[in-house]
Amino acid sequence: MKPVNAKIVEIVEESPTIRTFRFDISFDDALPGQFVMVWVRGVDEVPMGSSYLNGITVQNVGDATSKLFDMKVGDSVGLRGPFGKGFTLPKKDEHILIIAGGVGAAPLGPLADYAAECGAKVTTILGSRECYELVFEDRFSSAGELHITTDDGSAGTCGFVTTVLADMDVSVYDRICVCGPEIMMANVMKALQEKDALDRSEFSMHRYFKCAIGVCGACCMDPDGLRVCKDGPVLNGSLLIDSELGDHKRNSSSQRVRV
């Protein structure tokens, strides 16, 4: 699949390090949790979870995202996708728990929107290091019940998403959907295992993608060889309990490095 030229039509500053970029094209068939490959010309092509049908929400963490942050309305990138498996779509009257950390809120925003529109009940735990790094607070609040956590206590509960999760009866949720920093997700996975809820959980994984179609193996997870771009990026929690999640990942040279 060749990249399609996409012109930036709007830039929203979500936090000092996170921005949403909207484009003049829309992936109307994209499902919550799927991703697109963003070609930042002259730098790199990187995977980004769709936060809107015509938008991505990005944290400035590397060369490609730094170049993207230098762009203005009217500049363009190349987009191809959508790729991968997204979250299981909720049904009317189901109750889903969303657990989002930092920019991990990006692929969960569309899920919250869809759930609210179809008549499902939504509860969200939204975490960040500080209050100004909270992403899509109003969006999740509009979808249903919202619990906020910050590492420094500047908003909501002082602590981590697992601080709130520890006191929850997760048996009331039909599905638990998670995305955030890997260490956060590993801790959530352990908490859900203790609550016997892993089989009802789905995690949106982050790995280094090259081909995005499951051929090159750059995004494979040990020990089962799960291809995150093809088998995921959304994977059932029961598949991850004995995986490298929270311990190792592969770098751009496909070498195993510690998270």
Curated annotation (Swiss-Prot):
SUPFAM superfamilies, sorted: Ferredoxin reductase-like, C-terminal NADP-linked domain, Riboflavin synthase domain-like
InterPro entries: Cyt_c3_hydrogenase_gsu (IPR012165), Dihydroorotate_DH_Fe-S-bd (IPR019480), Dihydroorotate_DHASE_ETsu (IPR023455), FAD-bd_FR_type (IPR017927), FNR_nucleotide-bd (IPR039261), PyrK_electron_transfer (IPR050353), Riboflavin_synthase-like_b-brl (IPR017938)
Residues annotated as domain FAD-binding FR-type: 1-89
Cofactor notes: Binds 1 [2Fe-2S] cluster per subunit.
Pathway: Pyrimidine metabolism; UMP biosynthesis via de novo pathway; orotate from (S)-dihydroorotate (NAD(+) route): step 1/1
Subunit structure: Heterotetramer of 2 PyrK and 2 PyrD type B subunits.
Protein name: Probable dihydroorotate dehydrogenase B (NAD(+)), electron transfer subunit
Organism: Methanococcoides burtonii (strain DSM 6242 / NBRC 107633 / OCM 468 / ACE-M)
